[in-house]
Amino acid sequence: MSSAHFNRGPAYGLSAEVKNKLAQKYDHQREQELREWIEGVTGRRIGNNFMDGLKDGIILCEFINKLQPGSVKKINESTQNWHQLENIGNFIKAITKYGVKPHDIFEANDLFENTNHTQVQSTLLALASMAKTKGNKVNVGVKYAEKQERKFEPGKLREGRNIIGLQMGTNKFASQQGMTAYGTRRHLYDPKLGTDQPLDQATISLQMGTNKGASQAGMTAPGTKRQIFEPGLGMEHCDTLNVSLQMGSNKGASQRGMTVYGLPRQVYDPKYCLTPEYPELGEPAHNHHAHNYYNSA
């Protein structure tokens, strides 16, 4: 079985458009720099076609073993497809342990099936940057920035909690001195002025505004009876049947003659009803002959 079995056919439509865009990002100048670097480290010739020379994974495994000895334990020299894919997989695992980020690493099919040579080139450039960071003399890639860690004593860290950073703005030298807890009473006087004893509770401070001389004298608790007369005038025993003008006018109406709710009410006035003068039944003056009585059989 030859490696041509894994080569894909031509792409069409959207797949062809994506493949062309990826191919346009491929940098041939970077390819030449990577070729010189890999050949200089391994001492082996890659060949005319750069990607085809790396396709079996043998040179890649030897290359990572030079950068990090013992990274790949076994390198398959066979021409079988699965052996070549195994070499590429071992190379990917080795550079991951070496420090290359997973999102910078290509997939095995990107190289073996010629699907994304641009990603393969990006992975080799990331490997060059990591090698330069570790101290290898490489003319390819960019050296990663080193971490600048700072360690502070616990006392310094505690002092920093009391400082308001300029990123939060400025408090214009204001403080919370004299502030009380949420919901507690706040005094509206200054102890430095000798007015520690507050005024009586009946006096409304000017800081609260003015009540225009009004007071709560004569006010009663909610729900209690309120007298609508002046005690000084001796009007405590007024007639409770009279409706005060403060409540409106009843137009002279009263409840005289009204009965308790539910009792029968007489709908006639005795002044307009005459008393009968003829003798009633059973009285001596009653004429019994004027009436006919029949026995009910």
From Swiss-Prot:
Tissue specificity field: Smooth muscle, and tissues containing significant amounts of smooth muscle.
UniProt cross-references to CDD domains, sorted A to Z: CH_CNN1 (cd21282)
Record PTM Phosphothreonine, positions in chain: T170, T180, T184, T259
Ranges: Calponin-like repeats: 164-189, 204-229, 243-268
One cellular component (GO) term of this entry: focal adhesion
Domain Calponin-homology (CH): from-to ranges: 28-131
Annotated S-S bridges: none
Phosphoserine: residues bearing it: S175
UniProt cross-references to SMART domains, sorted A to Z: CH (SM00033)
Alphabetical list of PROSITE patterns matching this protein: CALPONIN_1, CALPONIN_2, CH
Assembly and interaction partners: Part of cGMP kinase signaling complex at least composed of ACTA2/alpha-actin, CNN1/calponin H1, PLN/phospholamban, PRKG1 and ITPR1.
Function of the protein: Thin filament-associated protein that is implicated in the regulation and modulation of smooth muscle contraction. It is capable of binding to actin, calmodulin and tropomyosin. The interaction of calponin with actin inhibits the actomyosin Mg-ATPase activity.
Record-given protein name: Calponin-1
Organism: Homo sapiens
